[in-house]
Design a protein with these regions (language model features):
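Condensing-enzyme catalytic core mediating Claisen C-C bond formation in acyl metabolism
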Residues: 1-186, 293-358, 450, 459-507
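Conserved catalytic cysteine-centered active-site region
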Residues: 162-183, 223-263, 267-274, 320, ...
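Short, well-ordered amphipathic alpha-helical segments that serve as non-catalytic structural scaffolds
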Residues: 188-204, 233, 339-355, 429-437
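Conserved beta-ketoacyl condensing-enzyme motif
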Residues: 189-247, 251-252, 357-388, 393
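Structural signature of cysteine-dependent C-C bond-forming condensing enzymes
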Residues: 202-211, 241-246, 270-277, 353-359, ...
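Acidic, glycine-rich active-site loops and adjacent beta-strand->loop/helix elements
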Residues: 216-221, 252-257, 280-286, 450-455
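Short acidic, glycine/serine/threonine-rich loops at helix termini
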Residues: 224-227, 259-262, 287-293, 324-325, ...
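Flexible, glycine-rich active-site loops centered on histidine and acidic residues
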Residues: 270-305
């Protein structure tokens, strides 16, 4: 069977300190319910600088400057480590400062809804020219204006505590096109655009070779008649210059990225498309989500970055890791919600299809939330909790002995390093490292697991989850082992059919 492969992955973070207070859900709700609270007075004192965010170890892992194994060697909490010197750019992507991101929101705005002051544009324009040369055809959109002439409904754009622009509403009465929604959607679009650019840069991919895009964030764009009509995918493709691509949006809360990887792989495996890009931008609402707990404990607000990623899936090239589309796990409607049932469906079931043991998987990528964030908020170490459940399942199945639980977790698990941006930590942060580990490294098989809490949408209480197995490529490409390609086979078949038809006519 000829399987699709992972061809590359790009990852970005965007430092958005002013958005924490103005646009994060926790601070926004607090302003409405308790406008004079001590938390709102104190939170600005707990926001990190751009340099601190760049130097933060988990962020350096996210963009590929350090590996998960290197992160394991550092004692927690990681936010206390002050002597590390990080870099803006990494192997997989970059950490974007807030001023440049606001300018990119303007560049990604297709309806002239973003207004920036002339002073701000003058200060940021040289940075955009230098750091985002691929967007040069759109640089004319980055122009300043008089921002004092605001309309009634607008979302302020703030940098270093100063209003430098605003987002207009897109319709007088349509609640789905008000300034707040347009702001959130432009945040998703712009961060998705940067993620796609980083993928193209890191792996030197020709944008014209991509023919489909699957966008899998947690926002929705539409109007009063179709709130989630879409389409982020095609809007991102347009800005990035994927001129031969179309696309669509896929949603599934935190499980969406793994759903998207499976869907993209199926599209390539079936031959519908050759190269499919899976992409997602970040969620401004989740900035400072656990800020109250962090501030209460005297910590910095650790949820101070937007996240984004892009993964390219293509036809088997004989080199990159293969995606086993026949070894997929899924949480069915009738599966149940107990930990044993969930892990059985997502981990054991796909392995059973190939008569594999849980120990035959070298590494599991699960919900890779940074435990610095979650432990201080009382939610524990999420990746570790997942690995404990997988280890317990392995022991129940007889794949390991109970005394091996700890060593199993150490050998098969990863430390969490991704921001708590919902879909962002879910399985996909490891794909960049996975490509290296299963080509140049010592690993042969991995599993990506994505899980989601569907009750948040109030349509069902069901849990959700999907998983897929990834393996080292053995170099064999179906149809080419004997020096013959798929296209050549098609030509031979077509010629044979023509000969048969001609002979039948002559008779």
């Amino acid at each position: 069977m000829n399987y699709p492969v992972f061809k590359g992955a790009g990852y970005i973070l965007v430092h958005t300190p002013d958005m924490i207070v103005r646009n994060g859900s926790t601070c926004s709700i607090e302003r409405v319910t308790n406008p004079d609270s001590e938390f709102l007075k104190e939170v600005p004192n707990h926001i990190r600088s751009y340099e601190e965010v760049v130097n933060y170890l988990p962020n350096q892992v996210y963009i590929g400057n350090k590996t998960p194994d290197e992160l394991k060697a550092y004692p927690m909490p990681w936010y206390d480590i002050k002597d590390e010197q990080g870099q803006r750019h990494g192997k997989f992507g970059q950490i974007v400062p807030q001023d440049e991101f606001l300018a990119l929101m303007k560049i990604c705005d297709a309806f002239d809804l973003v207004k920036l002051s002339e002073e701000f544009v003058a200060s940021v324009r040289p940075k955009i020219d230098e750091n985002f040369k691929e967007l040069a055809p759109l640089f004319d959109k980055l122009e300043g204006t008089d921002i004092n002439d605001k309309e009634d409904d607008f979302e302020a754009l703030v940098h270093e505590g100063k209003v430098v622009g605003y987002v207009k509403k897109a319709h007088d009465v349509d609640v789905n096109l008000n300034a707040h929604v347009i702001f959130e959607n432009l945040v998703v679009k712009a961060s998705g655009v940067i993620s796609a650019l980083e993928l193209l840069r890191s792996y030197k991919i020709n944008p014209e070779d991509i023919d489909y895009v699957v966008e899998c964030s947690e926002e929705a764009c539409g109007d009063i008649n179709q709130r989630g009509g879409g389409n982020f995918a095609k809007s991102i493709a347009e800005v990035v210059g994927l001129v031969n691509a179309t696309g669509s949006d896929l949603r599934g809360f935190c499980a969406a990225p793994t759903h998207a990887l499976i869907s993209a792989s199926a599209l390539v495996k079936s031959g519908v498309y050759k190269n499919v890009l899976v992409v997602a931008g970040g969620a401004s609402a989740k900035l400072g989500m656990n800020g109250k707990d962090h501030v209460k404990k005297g910590l910095p607000v650790l949820e101070d970055v937007l996240g984004g990623f892009a993964v390219l899936i293509g036809e088997n090239d004989g080199v990159n890791p293969i995606i086993r589309t026949d070894l997929v796990g899924k949480h069915n409607v009738g599966t149940g919600s107990s930990p044993q049932a969930v892990m059985g469906a997502l981990v054991a079931n796909p392995l059973d299809k190939a008569n594999l043991k849980i120990t035959d998987v070298d590494v599991f990528s699960v919900e890779m939330q940074n435990p610095d964030i979650t432990k201080s908020a009382g939610a524990g170490n999420v990746p570790e909790a997942n690995y404990k459940m997988i280890a317990a399942l392995a022991a129940m199945r007889g794949d390991i002995e109970k005394k091996e639980l700890k060593s199993f977790i150490e050998a098969k698990g990863l430390p969490g390093w991704a921001p708590t941006q919902g879909h962002i930590p879910s399985g996909v942060p490891y794909v960049g490292f996975l490509i290296d580990d299963l080509t140049k490294g010592d690993k042969n098989r991995a599993m990506i697991v994505g899980k989601g809490s569907l009750f948040l949408g109030r349509m069902t209480n069901l849990f959700d989850g999907v998983s897929i197995v990834i393996e080292r490529n053995n170099g064999a490409v179906e149809g080419e082992a004997a020096g013959i390609s798929k296209d050549e086979i098609r030509k031979i078949i077509a010629e044979s059919m023509r000969k048969i038809s001609q002979e039948m006519l002559e008779e």
